[in-house]
């Protein structure tokens, strides 16, 4: 690296700096284990609204959990549907 490149070298673009900072923030948030995401109650309510259009299911029959497995976030959704009556 010459003195001229050092003094007048290219500066990083603000978009690149912003992207790098955002990636750091996201990595820090993902590293915080044991915290329940804020969106789960809303997700549960919205799922209930959609499911109620098609089947009669109560909120107690919907279980949503989030955990880490092999370094990946896993969102698990369990819905217990009512038994269908045989005709």
Swiss-Prot record:
Q: Which SUPFAM superfamilies match?
A: Cell division protein MinE topological specificity domain
Q: Which InterPro entries match?
A: MinE, MinE_sf
> What Gene3D superfamilies does the record point to?
Cell division topological specificity factor MinE
Q: Which Pfam families match?
A: MinE
Ranges in coiled-coil conformation:
none
Q: List the disulfide bonds.
A: none
Q: Highest taxon of the source? A: Bacteria
**What are the UniProt keywords, alphabetically?**
Cell cycle, Cell division
UniProt record, GO biological process: cell division; regulation of division septum assembly
Family the UniProt entry places it in? Belongs to the MinE family.
Q: What does this protein do?
A: Prevents the cell division inhibition by proteins MinC and MinD at internal division sites while permitting inhibition at polar sites. This ensures cell division at the proper site by restricting the formation of a division septum at the midpoint of the long axis of the cell.
Q: What is this protein called?
A: Cell division topological specificity factor
**Lineage, top ranks:** Bacteria, Pseudomonadati, Pseudomonadota, Betaproteobacteria, Neisseriales
Write the gene name. minE
